[in-house]
Curated annotation (Swiss-Prot):
The gene is folD. Keywords: Amino-acid biosynthesis, Histidine biosynthesis, Hydrolase, Methionine biosynthesis, Multifunctional enzyme, NADP, One-carbon metabolism, Oxidoreductase, Purine biosynthesis. InterPro entries: Aminoacid_DH-like_N_sf, NAD(P)-bd_dom_sf, THF_DH/CycHdrlase, THF_DH/CycHdrlase_cat_dom, THF_DH/CycHdrlase_NAD-bd_dom. NADP(+) binds at G165, R166, G167, S194, I235. This is Bifunctional protein FolD. Its EC number is 1.5.1.5, 3.5.4.9. HAMAP family: THF_DHG_CYH. SUPFAM superfamilies: Aminoacid dehydrogenase-like, N-terminal domain, NAD(P)-binding Rossmann-fold domains.
């Protein structure tokens, strides 16, 4: 068996087409959506990711604002950058690129952010809204994974889903998202992690396995039921080499799988811009222009 590919680039293109259309509508009404980025230090993968976000903003017509802070700066400098974007009328939403260098407190900066300007959907208020099924920005990688399953019309309701990873940016919010009583959710979700000795005892019974651990090769072929859906959401870096959570040979067992490149990453960026245009639409509604 050779698995069919879940092409994140295809899913992202469809999302970005919708974003570009909505941006054009807003601009016709005098509203120009803007996305801000706070980057601390010069970590290679972070710089590449931020550059990709900027390129995609340009593609769909979203203005891009940047605040680059040297790693030698202080926590006070980071908090000042957050306040600047909070106060800026041109920035509808923004991100604090994670991870931060040692010595910086991400949670303190995140809590200072205005929840309505949280492009990543990670502010405690917005995670609470996700729990309560209230409107708000959804964390981008979980939202992108759900959009991918929806795009390929892969049934989730009532299915057994195993999420490997419990981090605040992917594993935990994804497990919440997939248990909501909504279309393309309402699944039976089990959350496991790298501290469990026999992960295969959980994954072999799953219809869908989503790896979000950031542990290279944590998912091996003998851990997957033939025909299952396998999504690699967690990554690690060895220098500039990307190492996915899912071993390449899993593609010989799975029914569907994300490719090594062009899987979840493009959908994450697309959902970031979707959150941004939704924030701009809310600004337009407050101004009576939408």
């Amino acid at each position: 068996m050779s698995a069919q590919l879940l092409e994140g680039k295809v899913v992202a293109a469809a999302v970005l087409e919708d974003v570009a259309r909505r941006v054009a509508v807003l601009k016709d009404k005098g509203i120009s959506p803007g996305l801000g980025t706070i980057l601390v230090g010069d970590d290679g993968p972070s710089v590449s990711y931020v550059n990709k976000k900027r390129e995609t903003c340009k593609q769909v017509g979203i203005a891009s604002f940047h605040n680059e802070i040297p790693a030698s700066a202080t926590q006070s400098d980071l908090l000042a950058a957050v306040r600047d974007f909070n106060d800026s009328p041109d920035v509808d939403a923004y991100i604090i690129q994670y991870p931060l260098p040692k010595g910086f407190d991400f949670n303190e900066a995140l809590n200072l952010m205005l929840p309505e300007k949280d492009a990543d959907g990670l502010h405690p208020v917005n995670l609470g809204r996700l729990v309560l099924q209230e409107p708000g920005p959804v964390p981008c990688t979980p939202a992108g994974i759900r959009a991918m399953l929806q795009h390929y019309d892969i049934a989730i309701e009532g299915k057994e889903v195993v999420v490997i990873g419990r981090g605040p940016t992917l594993g935990r919010p994804l497990s919440l998202l997939l248990t909501l009583k909504q279309p393309y959710a309402n699944a039976a979700v089990t959350v496991v992690h790298s501290g469990i000795k026999d992960l295969g005892a959980y994954t072999r019974r799953a219809d869908i396995v989503i790896a979000a651990a950031g542990c290279p090769g944590i998912v091996q072929p003998d851990m997957i039921r033939p025909g299952a859906v396998v999504i690699s959401g967690g990554i690690s870096w060895e220098g500039r080499k990307l190492l996915p959570d899912v071993d390449e040979a899993v593609g010989e067992v799975a029914g569907w799988i994300t490719p090594r490149l062009g899987g979840v990453g493009p959908t994450t960026v697309a959902m970031l811009l979707l959150n941004t245009v939704q924030a701009a639409e809310e600004r337009a509604r407050r101004a009576g222009k939408l």
